[in-house]
Amino acid sequence: MGMKYVLPLRLIGLAYLLVLFQVHRVTGWELSYEQYHAAHLNEAINPDSGWNKSTKNLLLPFNRTRVPGSEGSREIQRFIIEHFNNTLAGEWAVETQAFEENGYRFNNLVMTLQNNASEYLVLAAHYDTKIAPTGMVGAIDSAASCAALLYTAQFLTHIACHERTKEYNDLESNTVVSNSTLGVKIVFFDGEEAIEEWGPEDSIYGARRLAAQWLADGTMTRIRLLFLLDLLGSGEEEPLVPSYYAETHQEYQLLNRIEDDLLFRRGDEINGESALAAEVARQRKHLDPTDYRFLGLGHSVIGDDHTPFLAAGVPVLHAIPLPFPSTWHTVDDDFRHLDAAETRHWALLVCEFVVQSLRSRNQ
């Protein structure tokens, strides 16, 4: 995340709440989303270097600098592309957008599920890191967000594969992915950070380039929502993520209801999933739908990858805390200061948000 926020905010008091995720009936047999997460989430999103040998870890590969055009950047690009092409069994269409600007080589990565959908929900984060300070790996900025999106893609692929079984084919009205007119795009932006000093020509390189392409080819008119994640996963007392735009406050309220389900649901539905339940029990609220401070402004208070899409009329849901965590743009933005539970919490929220968004189009 590049630009500083505009308005100083006070830290809101936080409560630590309880417990578990909702079980959904999606077919003739119960596919428990909570059970899927209990089986896969901890291994997929774990910053502990002891998990280095796990090929299923989606977070640790980001524990490196990812300056545009560098070998670290190329390695993480290969990792992301391989995740979609191989690990996810080719369910997603993979596009790259390579270009040069200001003396640097950039490459956006765009992944699409349901390539022929009439509209798209776009999930996005940037994968690059700042040039200075030297050695900054950008754990919250934005390795954690990228890992959450990779996990969301894995989760959606799991659902899509099951929907091709006979049980799902016999109960089409209960499908989530297959019959939705809403597709999903996951975008990994390059070049969000400034090369020298943040400004309109030295920032959000990838977002500006992709927005121009989507305006030219008509894709922009098919984007129902851009859901952008940034600066998530801090281990400190992270401030709340406010609702920034009146146009998407309804989507923000949906995300808030999902978080309430996650935090308030009691343990009688756990059925032995104690490890995940204990982790959820330590979580707190991140959203406050009664905070209307920004809804009447009619403009952004934060410069980020969403701005060219917002200017083009795309509704934006921006998940970024304000004020920013204290490790922002310092060498302390590393994996020692990254909170795995916070990162997993956001992965769960995004997964359920996408499922409910797709389901709403099937009704």
UniProtKB/Swiss-Prot annotation:
It holds the Pfam family Peptidase_M28. Keywords: Acyltransferase, Transferase. The keyword Transferase applies. This is Uncharacterized protein YFR018C. One of its GO terms (cellular component) is endoplasmic reticulum. The keyword Cell membrane does not apply. Present with 3970 molecules/cell in log phase SD medium. One of its GO terms (molecular function) is zinc ion binding. It comes from the Eukaryota. SUPFAM superfamilies: Zn-dependent exopeptidases.
